[in-house]
């Protein structure tokens, strides 16, 4: 089973959250997003947790960055993602 954290709350994140939620063997542990309104709505829709606080980032096997191209590098470097986790 893959435990997944989805980072972002835009259109791409919405589509990915729906797909992950329907995928057998995958568990969407958390939506991590700076936009509280969209982040909480996306989390509620998919039955998962939401946070915007890096200290609350869930431990997962896979972290999916569904954010703007401009934000990817800075965000990936600033979040406490475990070294053994996969990031896409």
Where are these regions (language model features)?
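NAD(P)+-binding Rossmann beta1-loop-alpha1 motif at the extreme N-terminus of oxidoreductases
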Residues: 1-51
